[in-house]
Amino acid sequence: MANTPEPLTTEAAQVVSETDLGAAKLLEPSALWLEPYQWVSVAMLVLIAIMLWKKVPSLVTGGLDNKIAEIKAQLDEAKALRAEAEKLRDEYTAKIANAEKDAEAMMENARHEADAILEKAEADSKALVERRKKMAEDKISAAERDAVDEVRATAAAAAAAASRKLIAEKHDAEADRKLADEVIAEL
């Protein structure tokens, strides 16, 4: 048996067990009556016990809980921001709709005012033309009256001058006395 391995022994091993691997037998080390897989299990139990004693799971869960709380707060904040953004969007949509209605109403009002101004301007211009026509007619009438008055005054002045001249030519002191006596007698 040239290929058969030699049994291994360690100084720490007090008990050596044999394992049958087919044709060859291997010796596995053991200490304090425990096999290697049992030592791994004991080490894991000790590690878990130390972790429990140092409260590592509560630290881990506390950290996870804090992280969960932060994420939840961020989600709540995001929901609040989204709700606020939607509210602002709806508000501005309503404002835009109102602004469009107001603009349309203002345009309609401006059209009505422009029409009213045009109608008033037409009426005012007609009234102005009528007033100016009447003023022109009044000026013409006044000029005619002034001309007639001037002609009358000129005629009266000419008649008075002619009367004076005639009276002066045909009327003497005797006629004046006679006329004065008649006027006095009538009184």
From Swiss-Prot:
Keyword Transit peptide annotated: no
Membrane topology term: Single-pass membrane protein
Subcellular location(s) of the protein: Cell inner membrane
Cited InterPro entries: ATP_synth_b/b'su_bac/chlpt (IPR002146), ATP_synthase_B_chain (IPR050059)
The organism's place on the tree of life at top rank: Bacteria
Keywords: ATP synthesis, Cell inner membrane, Cell membrane, CF(0), Hydrogen ion transport, Ion transport, Membrane, Transmembrane, Transmembrane helix, Transport
GO molecular function (one): proton-transporting ATPase activity, rotational mechanism
UniProt cross-references to Pfam families, sorted A to Z: ATP-synt_B (PF00430)
Regions that span the bilayer: 36-53
Keyword Ribonucleoprotein attached: no
GO cellular component: plasma membrane; proton-transporting ATP synthase complex
Main location: membrane
Known role: F(1)F(0) ATP synthase produces ATP from ADP in the presence of a proton or sodium gradient. F-type ATPases consist of two structural domains, F(1) containing the extramembraneous catalytic core and F(0) containing the membrane proton channel, linked together by a central stalk and a peripheral stalk. During catalysis, ATP synthesis in the catalytic domain of F(1) is coupled via a rotary mechanism of the central stalk subunits to proton translocation. Component of the F(0) channel, it forms part of the peripheral stalk, linking F(1) to F(0).
Subunit structure: F-type ATPases have 2 components, F(1) - the catalytic core - and F(0) - the membrane proton channel. F(1) has five subunits: alpha(3), beta(3), gamma(1), delta(1), epsilon(1). F(0) has four main subunits: a(1), b(2) and c(10-14). The alpha and beta chains form an alternating ring which encloses part of the gamma chain. F(1) is attached to F(0) by a central stalk formed by the gamma and epsilon chains, while a peripheral stalk is formed by the delta and b chains.
HAMAP family xref list: ATP_synth_b_bprime
Family: Belongs to the ATPase B chain family.
Protein name: ATP synthase subunit b
Source organism of this protein record: Erythrobacter litoralis (strain HTCC2594)
Gene from which the chain derives: atpF
